[in-house]
Structure formats: C-alpha cells, structure tokens
Design a protein with these regions (language model features):
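Long, low-complexity, Lys/Arg-enriched
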Residues: 2-4, 54-55, 60-61, 84-86, ...
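N-terminal signal-anchor module of multipass membrane proteins
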Residues: 5-19, 23-24, 30-52, 79-82
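Short, glycine-/Ser/Thr-/acidic-enriched flexible segments
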Residues: 45-47, 81-84, 155, 247-248, ...
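N-terminal short beta-loop-beta anion/metal-coordinating cradle
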Residues: 48-79
Length: 359
C-alpha cells in the first residue's frame, strides 16, 4: 500500500488559482444542453446541506419517482438512509429503487443521471449500492453504464483529494483519510487513503488500483476539458474514475468535461459527496441561515438540537456547544436501553418528562 504523509494546509495553495468566470461560463453552456434529470439517492440526511430549494422525498415508490422526473426542477433527492441498513437490507432497497426508477423513466420519457450521495470520509455501502443499481437498471433499461465516478471532495467539511489521496482537514493539517477515526468505523472500516487503492480494497480486487482512471488537479486547473473528456471516453466495464479536487471550481471543470462525454454517448453513475450534487444540479450559493430566516422577530419559543454520532469529532463539537452555550438544557439519552423493550419504554418516558419541563 502506498505510503502517505500528513500535509500542511498550505498544500491547497500549490496550484494556480482557477479562472472562476471562465470555468462557470463553460459549465453553464454545457448544462444548458444537458437534458437529464439529476436523481440523488442519499444514504444519510446530511446530503442536502449544500443545496436549497430542492425536493427531498422520503420514499422511493414509482409514483414518487414520476413526480420527481416530471417536476420542473433540475434535480431531486430521495433519502434512503441506507447507511444505517444491513448489507441485505440495502441490497433489497436498491433493487426496489432501480425497478421503480426505471419504470418511472420509461413512462415519463425523462432520462436521468444517478448520484449515489454518500459520506465524504468514505463510509457507506460501497461498492454494494452502485453495483446493485447498475445490475438492476441494465436489466430494465437499454443503457449500459461505462463507469462510476468517485468524487468525495467536500469543501465545507474539509475533505480534499490530492494526487489521488483523500484527506480530512484537522486544524492546519491534512490527514490521510485512512488514518482518521472514520476509517476505523465498525461497519465500514478501510485502510487505504489513495482512492485508487481504496477502490481495489473495497471491491476485493475487482478493480485494481493501476486500472482506476485518475483525473488530476493539473488537468483541472489547466481547464484541459479535452484531455479529461477523452479519459472519460475511454472508460468501460463500469471502471472507476477518481476525481481530484480542492475547490468547487475543480469540480465544475470536471463536470463540464463529464457533460461533454455524456453528450457523446458515455453513461456514468456518480458516487460522491454533496459537492458534486451542487455543481451538477446548478444550485446557487446561499449564505448560512440567520435567526430571522427561521422565525418571526417576536417568536419566543425555543428549539430542539438533536445530536447523535459515535465519532469523536461530534463529541468535541457537543462539548464546545455546552461550554459556549450553558443556557441550553442538555438531556442525554441512554442508548444502552435499546436492547431491552421495558428499559427503552422507561427511558422514553424519562426523556419525554424532562423535555416537557422545558417546553
């Protein structure tokens, strides 16, 4: 396995600054010609955090897919929450999704591109979900998938891909993803930080690292659309494509190249973070929500913050909230009670009684 090192945050500034105006002009031109609906299957509720004014469905019936495909929106989300499923359950659900999506597409005549939105720290049912979707959709529709695009870059969370190595920002340091607590997840553990090796690891060698196609930062910063497009034109057999990115302009250059390859008949599925959804869906930037965006000026009622995660970073965030906002009331749910029906019922009553005191 390739040896990778921690890197200073200054590494992100090692490439020439992108020409943002030129990048987005080219992207708009290609999006204008793109006639496919963007369908986002989200394995966790956090996937909508980079978008706004989009529909989010919480079921995957044929009627739901028809409604999404027939809408005037460029994209829509279907929240599967499948990261919490067993392998068997997510297989069953994704077969059902493929069946209903294929039927809806055939009946509406609306083509689509699929984004399997997942974790920017590489946790999730990969390659199970996208392999299941590919197999089922190819059995139901005439299209054949040439490849799968892996794009886990997520600026807002400090997740960057450089020279195929995926990093997680921790303070002023870029830590290879395989060395973080996320890689030690009890369900989705992995070792490789180089995404080409990660593909080989997660697919059990079905897609060897040396055969995975890589889109470099140098190509993207040069805006070498032709070179990137030709790489995509050469992909077949559902081979994996790793996209390096450290800013949204890098994603935009890649998406422009992808759109040109798609116009020439290439068919890809995406597996990535929320960033690629925002770019391919042409979702505009929007500032963080303010108090006045959420409630009337004279509103005195409070709100509920629900925190639930087993990773250390979330614990640190909660501790910072407790220290900075001592006026908030904190109620801790005893998760160990979920294994006993009577204990769980008692804990539920306790939490409800405590909550009612503060409402």
């Amino acid at each position: 396995m390739r040896a990778v090192q921690h890197q200073p945050i200054s590494l992100l500034d090692s490439w020439p600054a992108p020409d943002t105006d030129a990048v987005h002009h080219a992207l708009r031109e290609e999006l204008r010609r793109f006639d496919r609906k963007v369908v986002v299957l989200d394995d966790d509720p956090t996937g909508v955090q980079t978008v706004h004014d989009v529909s989010v469905y919480t079921d995957w019936t044929e009627e739901t897919f028809r409604a999404g495909l027939e809408s005037n929106d460029r994209l829509f989300f279907v929240l599967t929450n499948s990261r919490s499923f067993s392998a068997g359950e997510t297989t069953r659900v994704h077969r059902e999704i493929a069946e209903h999506l294929a039927a809806a597409s055939q009946k509406t005549g609306v083509p689509f591109v699929l984004i399997s939105r997942s974790d920017s720290t590489l946790r999730g049912h990969f390659p199970l979900e996208t392999e299941t979707l590919r197999t089922e959709l190819e059995a139901l529709l005439p299209e054949r998938y040439d490849g799968e695009i892996l794009l886990p870059f997520f600026l807002e969370g400090g997740r960057y891909t450089i020279d195929n190595v995926h990093y997680v920002r921790e303070g002023d340091t870029l830590v290879p993803a395989g060395e973080t607590e996320f890689a030690r997840d009890t369900t989705f553990a992995y070792r490789a930080s180089d995404l080409t090796e990660w593909c080989q690891e997660k697919t059990g060698g079905a897609y060897p690292a040396e055969q995975v196609v890589s889109i470099s930062l140098d190509e993207l910063r040069r805006r070498d659309y032709d070179a990137v497009c030709e790489k995509l034109m050469g992909v077949s057999g559902f081979n994996k494509v790793v996209v390096n990115a450290v800013c949204y302009d890098d994603v935009a250059v890649f998406v422009t190249s992808y759109l040109r390859a798609a116009a020439r008949g290439k068919v890809f599925m995406f597996r990535g973070s929320a960033a690629v959804v925002k770019v391919l869906g042409a979702v505009s930037d929007q500032p963080l929500l303010r108090r006045e965006d959420l409630m009337c000026a004279d509103q005195r009622n409070g709100g509920i913050i629900i925190v639930g995660s087993h990773v250390r970073k979330t614990t640190m965030q909660l501790e910072a909230l407790q220290k900075g906002c001592p006026e908030i009331e904190y109620i801790c749910f005893d998760v160990n009670t979920v294994f006993d029906d009577a204990a769980l019922a008692a804990e539920r009553r306790r939490i409800l009684d405590l909550s009612l005191i503060h409402i």
